[in-house]
Structures are given as structure tokens and as C-alpha cells.
A protein has these predicted regions:
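Boundary at the C-terminal end of the N-terminal hydrophobic targeting segment
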Residues: 13, 19-24
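Aromatic- and glycine-enriched glycan-recognition loops and surfaces
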Residues: 152-261, 348-356
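Active-site-proximal substrate-binding groove within the catalytic cores of carbohydrate-active enzymes
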Residues: 116, 138-169, 245, 259-578
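A mature extracytoplasmic/lumenal domain signature
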Residues: 39, 110-112, 193-195, 322-324
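Positively charged n-region of N-terminal signal peptides that target proteins for export
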Residues: 1-4
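Bacterial N-terminal signal peptides
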Residues: 6-16
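Loop/turn elements at helix/coil->beta-strand transitions in domains of secreted/extracellular proteins
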Residues: 133-134, 181-188, 233-240, 312-318, ...
Length: 580
């Protein structure tokens, strides 16, 4: 596993409650105290976990324990990790209230018998509308007009026909097939190139939908896009948009207004700075976030997009690509605006504006996911508590739990470190062949499937190259094989997978990359009463019945799989979930 550098910051904000000392009870000697909090993760924008409750347990010399009244305990909190060192929680007695996203450490202090006993624990505030640790996040490339520059000629994106790679109507078919292959797992798909001109065109404007993508029966391309978002829901898929807040092009309808408001990057002499080029004849420029925000233009284009496509709000998510605060090597986006006399806009000033952008979207019901963190921002800035998911994972997984910062892929050339898990992108597979999706099912089973399962448990410790999770789950190499187990229940043995599909009622997905014959798999504990199972082959067109009432003997299933085959396993007679 390649770990990415992350600096943990400590906040100064503290809250406390007065300690009331008490005497010993029943002659027992207090030896230590343990602080507990329930729930451990606060999700103020999801479900019921909006506040937490603290309890301090006293452990006595005779081995007994009891809960110590909160009125006798002093509680204090401090931020452990959060973007901008913000206060993460506030306390009122033994109750914990979320303030901002991040991780806080809560300490309890008890005075007894002339001694002070202390204990601490961490609490996580994930202020997101969606749980990205339990969602497959993908991108679907739709279109890009123009002739690519030489360095991009061989990219699959620019093969013949890239002006319209996938129409809105074709996109629904991709979504349907993907839902079949993934057995209905919750999904988010961000559309790339949905705007006029396709990918990397028209920015900073988001006001016109690509007319080339329109369905014949619709009056406008906007109607078709809104139709796709609504239809995608039928296949367990939230359709949203891939947007960009830093790039700009001269053909944009907003070009003159942004120039007039001094919102584009300039070189040291004050001339507009070309930030790059993707398509011949169309130079790319960059937006200066603080200037755009100050002029109210960022807020205006965000509001306009939400108003134009109201269906987006139900999905509660948007993806901002290339959300950078500096160029490679820490170079400023705009050398001209870096000068004190022109605003002194350092990368830190860009980050301050980016935080405002995150909050502005959130206040309107949206999470903002991104391409990455840390790679084009000041050292240590990972938008912890602001960005719920990174397309390319860049947090320290032992410090940032998946519910606070979830991953797309972790490695460009492989499936990533199996011990921590990795999800998938899908985009590169669809670019090659969106109709047949070769390799999609295998990658899903090797990456997202076990990652989703592991996301239900807490990473406890990484020791001797073994990762220990809560609930007894362990991921490590055993006798040269990559193993994920929970006791004697094996979920993974190299590229043979046997993993509960926890998003469905009772289902296991088995997959093998090399294939095998007559391999014995122990069923999980909650299947102990199952005496026979039905097998279904997973295909693009749905699940195909394979075998009925396969016997389970002594809690074990004997299974044979062909190379790259995946099957769905259900208790015999159980109804198969999902759509065709």
C-alpha cells in the first residue's frame, strides 16, 4: 500500500464541564476509567445519528465496573483533524453536538480519592448527505469536440467519434447494464462532457447542455438530461455532473464578464496566462477563485445550475474536477494576483475560498467530491470534513476513516492494497467498450465488493503487515496468499472472492479470476440455518439461473467457477433482487 502524506492538525477550541469529586464506593478501589461514546460517527445530514452521548465506566479492583454519573465527570473536546482547524463538536453535559466535519478527541476527567482519572476517545463528524463508503462512484464520458493536441492523440477519449461518445439515451443503457453487473449496489455516476462542446469546453459557463446528446423525442438536450437523471434512479443510480471551477475558454459566454471582473489568472506582467491546452486552437485559462467569489460570480453559476436542473438536488452530490489551489510544484495559479499590490492571493487564500465553495454547495443540499486532495494544495490540506470522496485516494487510511474520506481508486496500475480495499472508476472500461464492458465485472468483484464489506468495520490497527478491523475482520498475507477473513469465514483468497453483498437482504457474490473446481467455502454465521442455495450467473442482462437447491453440508458450500465468472448465491427459494 502506498501511503500518502497527511499532516494532522490540532484545533485550539476547548469546551469543559466542572468536575465534582466523590469518595470511594463500598470499599472498592477505582483502578481506571473508560470513556465511551454512542454513536461513534455523527451524520447530521443523514438518518438519526445527529447527536452523541458520552458515558464513563469505572473499572474497580475487584473486577467489577459501573457507569459513573455524568454530573461527576468533566468532559472536554478538542479538534484532532479538520480542514482549517475548525471546531468539530460542542459539548453540553454528556451530550455531543456536531459543529463541522472532522475528528475530535473527547477527554473525560474524574477526581476520586485524591487522584485524577482520565480517559479519551475520538468522535467523527461526517456532515455529508451521502455515505460514500457504501456507494460505488463512477464517471461516464459522453462527448468532447475538437482535434486533440499531439500528447492526447492516442488517448481512448479521442478515438474516432469522440464528438459524441455516449448520448443520454445510450447512457441509460450503460446504467442498466452496470446495475445488473453490480447487483444493485448504490451508485453515483458523474457525467463528463454533458455541456455544450463536451468535456473541457465552455467553462466557466455551465448554462447550456450539449445539444448533440439530445434524444429525438425531447424538445431540448436539457429535457433529455433531466430525463436521464430521473430514469437512472430506477437502477439504483444517482446521475449527477462532473464540473470544473478553475478552467476557462474564450468561447465561453461568460468570458467578457470574467475578464472585466479580473477573474482570470495572469502572468507576472499582467497578461492573461494560458494554463494549458487540450484541443487544438482552444487555449485554456484559469479562474482566480477569490476574485470570482468576491464578485459573486461563483455563487451565481452554482445557483443557476441547481435551478436549471432541479433533479440534481435529490441526488445531493456534485463532482468538481481539478479543484486546485496551486500549480505543480506549489507555483501560484496567478503570479500577477500573488503580488501584494494585486491582492496577495496565495494558495492559502485560494483554499479559504474553496472552503467557502464547499459550504455553499452543502448549504444548498450538495456534497462536493473531487479528483484528489493534497496534490495541488498547500502542504497538509486535504479538505478533511469537507470533501467526502476522492477520485484518486490521497488520505492516510489509518487516520481518516472511510466514512469521512472515501476512495475511488488507489493505484493506477493495479487493484490497490487488498487489506484496505479500493473501489473502481469504470470510466476507462466504458471508453474502451461501453456496450460489452470487458473487465468491469471482474474489477468490481476484486475491488468494490470487498471494499464495501470492509467499509462496515472500523480499522483498528495495522501491525506486522496485517490490518485488524473491528468485528474480528483481518486482512493479511497468509502462506503467500492474500486473505481476508472473519474467524474461519474466508472472504478472499487471492483473486477468489466469496463476499456477502451487504446492500441486499441475504446474498453472497462469488467470483474467481483464474477459475477453480470443487472449492469449499464456509458460509458466514448468519447463514447457519441455510441448508441449500440457489446459484445465478451474473451477466450484463441480469442474473441467469445456474443451479437450484445446491446442498450446504456442515455450513460449507462446494463451488466451481470458470475463469472470470461471478455468481450470486441466495438461500434456496429466496427471491432474487434487482432489475433486468
Amino acid at each position: 500500500m502506498r501511503f500518502f502524506l497527511m499532516f494532522v492538525v490540532n484545533a485550539l477550541a476547548l469546551t469543559s464541564v466542572f468536575v465534582h469529586p466523590v469518595g470511594a464506593s463500598d470499599g472498592k478501589k477505582l483502578e481506571r476509567v473508560v470513556l465511551e461514546i454512542r454513536p461513534r460517527v455523527l451524520t447530521p445530514n443523514q438518518g438519526d445519528n445527529k447527536t452523541g452521548r458520552l458515558s464513563l465506566m469505572g473499572i474497580y479492583s475487584d473486577g467489577s465496573s459501573n457507569k459513573i454519573p455524568s454530573t461527576q465527570v468533566g468532559f472536554s473536546s478538542k479538534t484532532k483533524t479538520a480542514s482549517g482547524n475548525v471546531q468539530v463538536v460542542s459539548l453540553k453535559g454528556d451530550k455531543v453536538f456536531p459543529v463541522e466535519g472532522g475528528i475530535a478527541t473527547i477527554e473525560a476527567s474524574l477526581a476520586r480519592d485524591g487522584k485524577t482519572f482520565t480517559a479519551s476517545t475520538d468522535i467523527i463528524v461526517a456532515p455529508y448527505y451521502r455515505d460514500y463508503s457504501q456507494t460505488l462512484v463512477l464517471k461516464l464520458f459522453l462527448a468532447m469536440e475538437g482535434e486533440p493536441v499531439e500528447r492526447l492523440v492516442n488517448d481512448p477519449t479521442f478515438r474516432k467519434g469522440h464528438e459524441v461518445f455516449c448520448s443520454f439515451e445510450e447512457a441509460l443503457e450503460v446504467i442498466r447494464k452496470t446495475d445488473n453487473l453490480t447487483r444493485g449496489i448504490p451508485k453515483i455516476i458523474y457525467l463528463v462532457g454533458w455541456q455544450k462542446g463536451g468535456h473541457d469546453h465552455g467553462y466557466p459557463a455551465w448554462s447550456e447542455v450539449n445539444p448533440r446528446l439530445k434524444r429525438k423525442q425531447d424538445a431540448t438536450a436539457l429535457d433529455s438530461l433531466r430525463w436521464l437523471i430521473r430514469e437512472g434512479r430506477k437502477f439504483n443510480t444517482t446521475v449527477s455532473l462532473h464540473i470544473n471551477m478553475v478552467d476557462a475558454y474564450q468561447l465561453s459566454p461568460l468570458w467578457d464578464e470574467y475578464v472585466a471582473n479580473d477573474c482570470f489568472a495572469k502572468d507576472e506582467s499582467g497578461k492573461l496566462l494560458v494554463g494549458g491546452i487540450q484541443v487544438k486552437g482552444e487555449d485554456m485559462y484559469n479562474v482566480v477563485y477569490p476574485k470570482e467569489w468576491e464578485a459573486g460570480l461563483a455563487q451565481r453559476r452554482i445557483n443557476a445550475l441547481i435551478k436549471m436542473i432541479p433533479e440534481l438536488k435529490e441526488g445531493h452530490t456534485i463532482h468538481i474536477d481539478v479543484f486546485i489551489a496551486n500549480r505543480d510544484g506549489g507555483k501560484p495559479v496567478s503570479p500577477w494576483h500573488l503580488k501584494p499590490e494585486n491582492g496577495g492571493l496565495t494558495p492559502d487564500k485560494y483554499v479559504e475560498t474553496q472552503r467557502k465553495v464547499f459550504h455553499y454547495w452543502r448549504d444548498r443540499g450538495f456534497d462536493v467530491t473531487g479528483e484528489g486532495t493534497g496534490w495541488a494544495h498547500p502542504p497538509g490540506e486535504h479538505f478533511i470534513g469537507l470533501q467526502p470522496m476522492s477520485w484518486w485516494y490521497s488520505w492516510n487510511p489509518m487516520e481518516i476513516p472511510e466514512c469521512l474520506g472515501a476512495r475511488g481508486r488507489t493505484d493506477r496500475g493495479s487493484d490497490g492494497d487488498f487489506r484496505f480495499g479500493s473501489s473502481m472508476h469504470g470510466e476507462e472500461i466504458w471508453k474502451q467498450d461501453k456496450d460489452n464492458m470487458p473487465g468491469f465485472l471482474g474489477m468490481f468483484c476484486r475491488t468494490t465488493l470487498p471494499w464495501y464489506y470492509l467499509g462496515r468495520s472500523q480499522r483498528v490497527k495495522f501491525e506486522n503487515d496485517a490490518l485488524f478491523y473491528s468485528d474480528g475482520v483481518v486482512a493479511r498475507n497468509e502462506s503467500g496468499k492474500r486473505i481476508i477473513r472473519k474467524g474461519d469465514f474466508i472472504l478472499r483468497e487471492d483473486d477468489d472472492l466469496f463476499v456477502p453483498a451487504l446492500w441486499n437482504k441475504k446474498e453472497i457474490i462469488a467470483y474467481s479470476k483464474p477459475g477453480y473446481a470443487d472449492k469449499s467455502w464456509k458460509l458466514p454465521d448468519d447463514w447457519r440455518k441455510v441448508k441449500a442455495v440457489d446459484l445465478y450467473r451474473i451477466t450484463l442482462e441480469g442474473c441467469v439461473p445456474l443451479k437450484k437447491r445446491v446442498p450446504v453440508s456442515d455450513g460449507k458450500l462446494l463451488l466451481s467457477l470458470a475463469k472470470e465468472e461471478a455468481v450470486s448465491i441466495l438461500p434456496a427459494g429466496a427471491k432474487l433482487s434487482g432489475k433486468k
